């Protein structure tokens, strides 16, 4: 275990001694979240992230109405004898508005609402006539729906995995959403997945199978990004009875 994970694991262990709770994590998105093609290891970021969190000592429960990938035959292997928690809310090919339109139904069926929601949406909206209608308004609605179930939910909004012109034009909109929707008790933060991202397939350092879907390298990069974004909230969430989450006073 690297020093950063070791330090985090020690903090998590201390929280457990004081009385811990399970942190509910909702992976919400499109194919980047669902994955699961059987012809390639399309495990998504969820797979390495889950084991990173467990290795760091956190009691996490991935939630969602889905467990399968795009193809039912796709599998996620155990790691060091530990099974992967495959629950998620990823839907291959869906737009932001389509996810928004089904979210209330999904949330009503979860045993408990998420403490942290990881959102990866917008890739299927890049050809939309209006990003305001296709991305901004649905994402704001999604944040509002999540808060109806948990006023303290932490929302981590992933940037599109691309560096093309259309993806770049969407970036300031996501930053605007975060600024306008974050509150002292319910943070909304962006995750800059596009940094150090190489989408051209076939290169030794490529992060995708096909320009869009992360390969093993890309999946690990996304997991690293999400883990770093989650860290300011994990200890507080795990040791809190009500799941109140906000940044440390020093930040």
What are these regions (language model features)?
Residues 14-19, 52, 100-114, 144-150, ...:
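Surface-exposed acidic, glycine-flexible loop patches that form ligand/cofactor-binding
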Residues 81-87, 161-250:
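Catalytic His-Asp segment of secreted/periplasmic serine-dependent ester chemistry enzymes
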Residues 1-67, 234-251:
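N-terminal secretory targeting modules
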């Amino acid at each position: 275990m690297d020093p950063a994970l070791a330090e985090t694991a020690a903090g998590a262990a201390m929280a457990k001694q004081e009385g811990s709770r399970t942190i509910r994590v909702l992976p919400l998105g499109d194919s980047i979240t669902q994955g699961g093609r059987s012809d390639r290891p399309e495990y998504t970021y969820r797979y390495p992230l889950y084991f990173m969190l467990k290795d760091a000592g956190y009691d996490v429960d991935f939630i969602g109405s889905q467990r399968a990938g795009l193809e039912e035959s796709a599998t996620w292997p155990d790691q060091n004898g530990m099974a992967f928690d495959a629950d998620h809310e990823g839907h291959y090919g869906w737009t932001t508005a389509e996810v928004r339109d089904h979210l209330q139904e999904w949330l009503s069926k979860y045993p408990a609402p998420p403490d942290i929601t990881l959102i990866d949406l917008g890739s299927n909206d890049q050809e939309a006539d209006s990003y305001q209608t296709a991305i901004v308004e649905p994402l704001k609605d999604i944040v509002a729906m999540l808060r109806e179930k948990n006023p303290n939910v932490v929302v981590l909004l992933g940037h599109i995995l691309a560096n093309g012109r259309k993806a770049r034009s969407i970036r300031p909109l996501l930053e605007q959403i975060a600024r306008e929707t974050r509150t002292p008790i319910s943070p909304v933060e962006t995750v800059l997945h596009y940094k150090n991202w190489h989408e051209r397939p076939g290169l030794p350092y490529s992060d995708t199978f096909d320009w869009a879907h992360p390969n093993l390298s890309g999946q690990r990069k996304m997991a690293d990004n999400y883990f770093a974004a989650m860290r300011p909230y994990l200890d507080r969430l795990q040791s809190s009875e009500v799941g109140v989450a906000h940044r440390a006073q020093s930040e």
